[in-house]
Regions:
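A shared catalytic/ligand-binding motif for oxyanion handling
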Residues: 1-115
Length: 115
């Protein structure tokens, strides 16, 4: 991974939407108002097309609403997704509190191997 340039600054927001459509709509408005480059999301309503990168079960996502925040790479795992941009890898993770301890430890182990 290449080190980020010194003069790059990203505005990053993080939120758990609880699978609520109204919360996601409000988030998109806040993103526009604040000029966010990256939004790390858990339990999104659903991906909103271009600029959204989600794991297979739509529990973790990263939204890149700003066109200048171009992604370089992305990867999806069980409970997580990452996007690499400007030499920085950003993860969004969600592990259900209803998972068994065995499932949770397996998911954490998979994430740890990826990092």
């Amino acid at each position: 991974m290449t080190p980020p340039p010194e003069d790059i600054m990203m505005r990053i927001l993080q939120i758990n939407l609880g699978h609520c459509r109204a919360a996601q709509d409000l988030l998109l408005q806040v993103v526009r108002e604040k000029g966010a480059d990256v939004v790390i999301v858990s339990e999104q309503w659903k991906g909103s097309g271009a600029g959204w990168y989600a794991n297979a079960d739509d529990t973790a996502a990263i939204c890149l609403p700003n066109k200048r925040a171009a992604k370089w790479h992305t990867q999806v795992g069980c409970g997580w997704v990452w996007v690499e941009m400007s030499g920085v890898r950003i993860y969004s993770c969600y592990f259900s509190p209803n998972s068994t301890q065995q499932d949770f430890l397996g998911e954490i182990s998979n994430l740890e191997r990826d990092i």
